[in-house]
Amino acid sequence: MPVLATYFNVRRGRDPFFKFYMKTLFPRHVREYSEKYGIKLIGWFNVAHGWDFDNVIMFDLPSYGILDVMERDEGIQAIAHRGSEWIMERHHSMFLRERMGPELKIHL
């Protein structure tokens, strides 16, 4: 089963909004996407990349084709399109062919 890892940066001045979104709206969106598309949140992590601190969100995808299905849905189009574009850019996304071991736990 593939895993999508998407990197993003939170610009200064937007941190309070980002924290609000991640604590209140993000869990609801993840549940909706999980029910509708079968994707599962693995986790959201802060990572150091060079001199910057970035964030990475990892999703367990039922198949690579699910990005095409999500891209056709206008409500989630931007997220799916970004994920589809980043498939070939290692800096932004990586897809793993197998699931990680049982030691990886999902926290919502």
Regions picked out by a protein language model, each given a short descriptive name:
Residues M1-Q77, I87-L108:
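Short S/T/G/P-rich N-terminal loop/turn motif that feeds into the first structured element of a domain
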Residues A80-S84:
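C-terminal structural segments of small proteins and small subunits
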